[in-house]
Amino acid sequence: MKFIVKPHPEIFVKSESVRKRFTKILECNIRNIVKSRTESVAVFNRRDHIEVTSESDEFHAEVLEILTHTPGIRHVLEVKQTEFKDLHDIYEQVLELSGSLIEGKTFAVRAKRRGKHDFTSIELERYVGGGLNQAVESARVKLSKPDVTINVEVTNDRLNQVLASHKGLGGFPLGTQEDVLSLISGGFDSGVSSYLHIKRGSKVHYCFFNLGGPAHEIGVKQVSHYLWNKYGSSAKVRFISVDFEPVVAEILEKVDDGQMGVILKRMFMRAAGMIAQKMKIEALVTGEALGQVSSQTLTNLRHIDNVTDTLILRPLINWDKEDIVNLAREIGTEDFAKTMPEYCGVISKKPTVKAVKGKLEAEEQKFDFSILEQVVQDARMTDIRDIAKESKQAAPEVEQVQAVEEHAIVLDIRSPEEEDDNSLEIDGVEVKHIPFYKLGTQFGDLDQAKTYLLYCDRGVMSRLQALYLQEQGFNNVKVYRP
């Protein structure tokens, strides 16, 4: 197994020292993730590309998944590497591997060369292409928009034939930019805005203002853990949970109805700014888009920004909702967001779309700011890697079993894609497939006289979902870990 990783082109327009630093960070990021999930896979930095190799194909799918979801990579090439003697030997090897692919089709050969050879890249393309054209009678050379492009790379005495090319995330390697604190609610917008900053190279820490109790927090932790695990697991990041119910209660009791929405957002920014200052983070990230809701007009956003000196980044400010949802679907957060409750919208019945500074300040004079200071002081900070462990500690009553008891039903809560790749079948046991993101709405329709064992590959999502269901009053759930 061998992959050639091509860094994002923006890295190579940097100065020599910056380019070296960025590619070194990318190399370390890849190595850290690969080491944590596989065995006997080596990572090498080759100046303008990174090689990931192994003597076996055991972890092929896992490594490809890692590389195509790691920021800073333009594309990933799967290659077959062999030694060669001369130009004709290269042609024969290419014919053996690719001859059948060009039958009845147009083709072109694209070659790259590094090292000292007695032929140029153009001569290599002409020799191999001409040979293939003669050897495969039904094939025809076409240099512009061919049906098949055969990519060949020669490095010193090694021939790399490209078997497949996979698109990477692009962006910058994680850790090349400064850390940010994302205000995450679990909805479409905050998940996408967090992803965009991960992709751009920032370590994204997550700040959650809890308005909906334990069930809401569990859902947001799932989204945050998913984003970190899928796109940023080379970084150590924090999840901060702030119990904002006392602040909401104070607003509901003392603040004029029309000003509630903007003042709540101002309280969010004040609290997040305090937390960012403690963590020595220079910027906050939100999923706000211009005009999407009443608090997101230009006037209101300006009033919201003015309560903190911390920079507020809004990567989605000019995005349409449809585009946000489409990207959420692409990155895998849509299903979380669809089942996530929305609490902020119920705060104000007649929200102002053009707040006045004097009115806001007058209403905030009624507010007891010691409550805000206290909830920030009581904020819980968790290493995001410990979310799985925390779910065990938070719900010790969630029983974990290795064998299926009589009459119990196993619920496979993996995504449809995971279930299709490796379906769960147990002799003599009924197995139902309900994706985790539909469990909250469909579990109540099941026969509650039965016991249900939740199953996922690693046991993390099953524990979190079991905790969620128990918070909803269902006590007939356990975690299945065969």
Swiss-Prot record:
The active site is at residue 456. Residues 61-165 form the THUMP domain. GO terms for cellular component: cytosol. It catalyses: [ThiI sulfur-carrier protein]-S-sulfanyl-L-cysteine + a uridine in tRNA + 2 reduced [2Fe-2S]-[ferredoxin] + ATP + H(+) = [ThiI sulfur-carrier protein]-L-cysteine + a 4-thiouridine in tRNA + 2 oxidized [2Fe-2S]-[ferredoxin] + AMP + diphosphate; [ThiS sulfur-carrier protein]-C-terminal Gly-Gly-AMP + S-sulfanyl-L-cysteinyl-[cysteine desulfurase] + AH2 = [ThiS sulfur-carrier protein]-C-terminal-Gly-aminoethanethioate + L-cysteinyl-[cysteine desulfurase] + A + AMP + 2 H(+). It comes from Vibrio campbellii (strain ATCC BAA-1116). It holds the Pfam family THUMP. The lineage of its organism: Bacteria, Pseudomonadati, Pseudomonadota, Gammaproteobacteria, Vibrionales. Disulfide bonds join 344-456. Keywords: ATP-binding, Cytoplasm, Disulfide bond, Nucleotide-binding, Redox-active center, RNA-binding, Thiamine biosynthesis, Transferase, tRNA-binding. Pathway: Cofactor biosynthesis; thiamine diphosphate biosynthesis. GO terms for molecular function: ATP binding; CCA tRNA nucleotidyltransferase activity; tRNA binding; tRNA-uracil-4 sulfurtransferase activity. InterPro entries: Rhodanese-like_dom, Rhodanese-like_dom_sf, Rossmann-like_a/b/a_fold, ThiI_AANH, ThiI_fer, ThiI_N, THII_Thiazole_biosynth_dom, THUMP_dom. Catalyzes the ATP-dependent transfer of a sulfur to tRNA to produce 4-thiouridine in position 8 of tRNAs, which functions as a near-UV photosensor. Also catalyzes the transfer of sulfur to the sulfur carrier protein ThiS, forming ThiS-thiocarboxylate. This is a step in the synthesis of thiazole, in the thiamine biosynthesis pathway. The sulfur is donated as persulfide by IscS. GO terms for biological process: thiamine biosynthetic process; thiamine diphosphate biosynthetic process; thiazole biosynthetic process; tRNA 4-thiouridine biosynthesis. ATP binds at residues 183-184, 265, 287, 296. Its EC number is 2.8.1.4. The keyword Amino-acid biosynthesis does not apply. It is found in: Cytoplasm. Residues 404-482 form the Rhodanese domain. Its main location: cytoplasm. Belongs to the ThiI family. This is tRNA sulfurtransferase.
